[in-house]
């Protein structure tokens, strides 16, 4: 089997023509003959190069409104013929089938059509049949055939042409085959995802959209992102986003999406260390920073309101890795972009996936995303004392934060400001003690604050500790076999408590 192969005949059938002209020009200069259909053939001929119609080869026209163009033995025989098998060569000679050494395909834009909001019929018509078949056939026979399966591979193929002419090595053909199967598997999983709809049982890894990160969680680990970040945000300034940046950005977006009021949050290691809701974005920033000005250093900032100049001036004095906002004033950007490595993101109004995936052991865990947001109607008063209106507002506020904190988690809030939190603790009591200690270290008065827990209290101990600090309103899921002991403590000590019936573990 010859390692190097010269391309003599190319079949070209693409949806997107941009970037193709350089390749066609170079192939023509190398003496390569072209086969094509419809618009692609017209494109090649418009460049001034001859191109044989597939219909002339097969003696069949394009039928069924273009649904069947290349699906014919004279096409696929020329692609799948094994050049080192005499029997294959004899058969294609018998049936006058030309050898095809190169296949260039760019599939119908199925995902773009779905995203455009097109109707079902238009979406179905963008399910490519001939193109995907050509990709699989050419990739299967990579020993003899080169497959360029998407416009993303135009450049690497053009580089080979510029360096070696119309000659490819086995290693190069195998690489293109690998990329081709990545394209076909992603395409098929996208179609499955469309038909699967809200069931969300499709696990898709967008190999063709692989992004190499600086490193993984630590410098000695390699890291990659599979997917399309451009659908979530635009990066308008700063260094390359890292693995850890993405974890924090994801946590920040999940958290800020809980709030409709103007809100600012500061996160470190996926947990909020500062958060507040206020009338203006500047006021929200100041209150969020006051929650923990020490941990804010090197954090990720996120808000659901546009950043103005005054807010940018305040923010600029702090070192932080990333800022996410729906928009920025021109003056604000002039200030924020003074630090060249600072990552500035513009959040897009994109609906986030409804499923979450986590790889472990020898497989993948899949679950529905926790999109539940409790409201006043979900609160059940279990204490004799009723919470005030302000306490209810603060309890719902704190509940949103604790839901997005690592378990075990306790959140203390007051006046729609995160006062302190204890997160990621093996003991709920330790989480509360951590929060109390932090609040005191920054001078907060806990009298009138509320407490939120991500899961039930197995004993009254947390409520007792909080009560002694002046915390007289508590929100929790409830559900412990010893709930009544906790409720009894509340009644004996004038603590208002509501339960939601919904646990919010986060691991």
Predicted segments, located by residue:
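Glycine-rich nucleotide/cofactor/substrate-binding loop typically near the N-terminus or early
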Residues: 39-110
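N-terminal glycine-/serine-/threonine-rich phosphate-binding loop
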Residues: 1-57
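C-terminal binding/interaction regions
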Residues: 320-325, 330-342, 464-507
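Active-site/ligand-binding-proximal alpha/beta "capping" segment
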Residues: 83-132, 136-138, 380, 384-389
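Glycine- and Gly-Pro-enriched alpha-helical subdomains that act as flexible
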Residues: 273-293, 411, 417-463
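Cysteine/selenocysteine-centered motifs that mediate thiol-based redox chemistry or coordinate metal-sulfur cofactors
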Residues: 301-302, 308-317, 442-483
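Active-site loops and adjacent core secondary-structure elements that bind or stabilize anionic groups
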Residues: 152-160, 165-328, 332-335, 339-369, ...
């Amino acid at each position: 089997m010859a390692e190097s192969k010269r391309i003599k005949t190319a079949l070209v059938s693409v949806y997107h023509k941009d970037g193709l002209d350089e390749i066609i020009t170079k192939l023509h200069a190398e003496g390569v003959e072209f086969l094509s259909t419809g618009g692609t053939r017209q494109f090649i001929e418009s460049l001034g190069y001859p191109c044989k119609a597939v219909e002339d080869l097969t003696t069949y026209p394009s039928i069924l409104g273009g649904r069947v163009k290349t699906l014919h033995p004279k096409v696929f025989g020329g692609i799948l013929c094994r050049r080192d098998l005499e029997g294959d060569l004899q058969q294609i000679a018998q049936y006058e089938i030309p050898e095809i050494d190169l296949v260039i395909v760019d599939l119908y834009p199925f995902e773009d059509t779905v995203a455009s909001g097109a109707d079902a019929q238009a979406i179905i018509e963008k399910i490519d049949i001939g193109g995907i078949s050509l990709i699989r056939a050419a990739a299967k026979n990579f020993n003899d055939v080169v497959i360029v399966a998407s416009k993303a591979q135009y450049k690497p193929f053009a580089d080979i042409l510029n360096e070696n002419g119309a000659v490819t090595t086995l290693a190069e053909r195998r690489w293109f085959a690998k990329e081709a199967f990545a394209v076909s598997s992603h395409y098929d999983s996208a179609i499955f995802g469309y038909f699967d709809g809200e069931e969300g049982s499709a696990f898709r890894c967008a190999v063709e959209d692989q992004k190499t990160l600086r490193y993984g969680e630590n410098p000695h680990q390699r890291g990659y992102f599979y997917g399309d970040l451009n659908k979530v945000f635009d990066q308008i300034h700063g260094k390359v986003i890292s693995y850890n940046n993405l974890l924090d950005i994801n946590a920040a977006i999940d958290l800020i999406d809980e709030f409709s009021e103007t809100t600012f949050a500061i996160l470190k290691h996926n947990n909020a260390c500062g958060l507040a809701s206020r009338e203006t974005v500047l006021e929200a920033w100041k209150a969020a920073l006051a929650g923990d000005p020490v941990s804010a250093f090197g954090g990720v900032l996120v808000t659901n309101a546009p950043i103005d100049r005054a807010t940018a001036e305040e923010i600029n004095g702090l070192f932080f890795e990333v800022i996410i906002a729906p928009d920025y004033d021109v003056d604000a950007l002039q200030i924020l972009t003074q630090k060249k490595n600072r990552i500035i993101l513009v959040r897009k109004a994109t609906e986030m996936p409804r499923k979450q995936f986590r790889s472990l052991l020898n497989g993948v865990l899949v679950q529905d995303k926790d999109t539940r947001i409790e409201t006043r109607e979900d609160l059940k008063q279990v204490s004799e004392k009723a919470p005030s209106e302000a306490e209810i507002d603060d309890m719902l506020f704190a509940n949103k934060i604790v839901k997005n904190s690592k378990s075990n988690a306790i959140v203390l809030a007051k006046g729609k400001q995160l006062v302190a939190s204890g997160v990621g603790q093996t003991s709920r009591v330790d989480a509360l003690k951590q929060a109390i200690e932090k609040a005191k270290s920054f001078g907060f008065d806990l009298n009138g604050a509320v407490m939120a827990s991500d899961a039930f209290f197995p004993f009254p101990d947390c409520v007792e500790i909080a009560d002694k600090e002046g915390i007289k309103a508590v929100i929790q899921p409830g559900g412990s076999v010893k709930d009544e002991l906790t409720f009894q403590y509340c009644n004996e000590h004038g603590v208002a408590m509501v339960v939601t019936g919904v646990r919010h573990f986060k691991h």
